[in-house]
Structure formats: C-alpha cells, structure tokens
Amino acid sequence: MAVGVFDSGLGGLTVLDAVQRRLPEVPFVYFGDNAHAPYGVRDADDIFHLTCAATERLWAEGCDLVILACNTASAAALKRMQETWIPKDKRVLGVFVPLIEALTERQWGDNSPPREVAVKHVALFATPATVASRAFQRELAFRAIGVDVEAQPCGGVVDAIEQGDEILAEALVRSHVEALKRRMPHPQAAILGCTHYPLMEPIFQEALGPEVSVYSQANLVAESLADYLARKPEFAGAGTESKFLTTGEPRSVSNKATQFLRRRITFEAA
C-alpha cells in the first residue's frame, strides 16, 4: 500500500517528512519534477500537463492515491484534473484543503452554507501562479463569509531555497512581508501557501509579529491524510516500497534534498 507524493521540486519533502512521521507504516513514493521546476512561473496549461504526467508516473508505481504536495499544481491544475481526467479508481488530493479546514474549523465533507468564522483578515503568501489562480480565495468563499484575503506573490523565494541560499531567501521573505503589510497592516492569520515555505516559517513569524497565527501545511496535510486513509483504506495502493524519483539529475537532486531535510535522501531517475 503505497501513497504518491508529488512536487515540482523539493518543497514537497516538507510534506513527505510530516506524513512519514504520522504514518510510519505506509510506504511513500516521492516524485520531484526538478527538470521543470519552478512551476510558479509557468502558465496553467503547462502546469496541468506536467502534473498529469507526474501523476501517471506515480500510478505506475502502484500509488492509487497521489498527494499534490505543490500549491501551484493544486491551485492551477487539480480542479481540471478532477473534472476531466482522473479515473474513478484513483484519487488525487491537493494541499489547500487541510489549510482551509484548519482556518474555517470545518471538515471538508461539510457542505453546509458558508458561515462567519473567527478570522477576518488573512495574509496569503504563495508563488505568482498560485496567487494568479485565486484558488485559495475560491475555496475559502465556499466555506466562510466576511474574510478579507490579501495575497502576496513571493517571487524568488522558491529558487533561493532550492539553491540553498538561506540569506537571500530570508531577505526576500522579509521584503514580501513588508510589501503585504503596507496593504494589510494587521493580519490575524497568515497562510504559507507553498510547501517550500515551512523552512522559512520562523522568519515569516518574526517578520509578521507574535500576534499573527501562521498556518503551515506539512502537519495539517499529514493529519488530513491519516484521516482520509482511515475512512478510505481502499485507496492505499499496491506499491510496497518507498522511493524517491526525479526528472532532474539524481546525484545533484539527492545532495540538495539531503541538505534540505538534513538526512540522507537518495533519488533515482524517473
């Protein structure tokens, strides 16, 4: 019973780390489309086709359930995939859902009308493609009313993290937070809408201030996955071994991933 985890690069490893800790008995197959990263600057059609290709590769590894551990793919491709492409015996889940569940304090299956929630002012930090898709605002509007969302496209942050340039990544995060606070001086909550950003969570929190609740995805996604598999065990696929696949150069990606997670990760060519 293997579960697939997909990202355009290394950010999804933050999600993989959390789901492995939460579900140590489940094998996971991670697919990084490093040859085409970052997705955050690509158009929606391009993201759709790349995400479908990666998902098919994970199905071939015996993963009937695939997690898009990439907000750009979840925002720009998932709805179209679910409506036009995914067969009935497979499931593809995005990473927005657990965030919105946490923010609105309601379960995904709860289809009651949108209602007032405690949080009124939300800052969203994400890639330019995720911000342009407005997927977060759309999903939030189905569940909550009266929430003001101010979105900040965080150009350059993913590239800096993938290159291992922490000083540049930190400087960019601080400048993006400053830019957002000029438009929304007092957010109550901040959504880190990219799976790379948990690595920068302390910097976001420091720049935003202690009064802002920062929602980061990895642990929320892990809890959601555990709940999903408990309810739908038939989607734990036939695969039996954990592995790491990449469209990039395996040695280079392995070295970056090892730096990224601070434990040895060995990728093989997809």
Swiss-Prot record:
Record flagged with keyword Nucleotide-binding: no
Active site, per annotation: C70, C194
Gene3D superfamilies in alphabetical order: 3.40.50.1860
Keyword Thylakoid part of the UniProt annotation: no
InterPro entries in alphabetical order: Asp/Glu/hydantoin_racemase, Asp/Glu_race, Asp/Glu_racemase_AS_1, Glu_race
GO molecular function: glutamate racemase activity
Catalytic activities: L-glutamate = D-glutamate
Top-level taxon of origin: Bacteria
Pfam families xref list: Asp_Glu_race
Keywords of the record: Cell shape, Cell wall biogenesis/degradation, Isomerase, Peptidoglycan synthesis
Pathway assigned in UniProt: Cell wall biogenesis; peptidoglycan biosynthesis
GO terms under biological process: cell wall organization; peptidoglycan biosynthetic process; regulation of cell shape
Record: residues binding substrate: D7, S8, Y39, G40, N71, T72, T195, H196
Listed EC numbers: 5.1.1.3
Family per record: Belongs to the aspartate/glutamate racemases family.
Function: Provides the (R)-glutamate required for cell wall biosynthesis.
Name of the protein this chain belongs to: Glutamate racemase
Organism annotation: Cereibacter sphaeroides (strain ATCC 17029 / ATH 2.4.9) (Rhodobacter sphaeroides)
